[in-house]
Amino acid sequence: MIAHYSLILKPIHSPKNPELKQLRLLFEKARERKKKGLFVIEGEREIKKALLGKYNFTQLFIEEGSTPETPEVQALLNQTTAFQVEKNAFQRISRRSGSEKILAVAETKSHELEHLKLSDQALILVVEAPEKPGNIGA
């Protein structure tokens, strides 16, 4: 279980904890996410995808009694500020029901055109005002 991680996890017992209040703001307010340059990732699979995308993580929130299953996510416990959140408090901040017992806060990336890194033979598709944007890539 999470026993050997408890030394590096800061305990949170109340849903009124300032860290959880900030997390809730990031979940609910796009303006807050943009202002802080942060976003919330829920679930271990999504966190692993963000790791592959080389996102920088600032915080990790794990439900009390849970532990990350993958070594990559376990390694984040040593690289970020990590919290062990009491079950009731965690359920109040979590947006998904079920087995997702981990949340992360990561820094947003700039997706401006001037920051785009292209290979020498890149294929670029420009689409302006598509009628059904959901069909792009289908």
Residue ranges and their predicted role:
Residues R31-R33, R95-S97, L116-D120:
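Solvent-exposed alpha-helices and their adjacent loops that cap or buttress functional pockets
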Residues G65-E72:
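Short, charged/polar "capping" segments at the starts of alpha-helices
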Residues Y5-G65:
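Boundary-proximal intrinsically disordered activation/regulatory segments immediately upstream
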Residues L77, A82-S97, I102:
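Glycine/small-residue-rich loop that forms an oxyanion/phosphate-binding "nest" at active or ligand-binding sites
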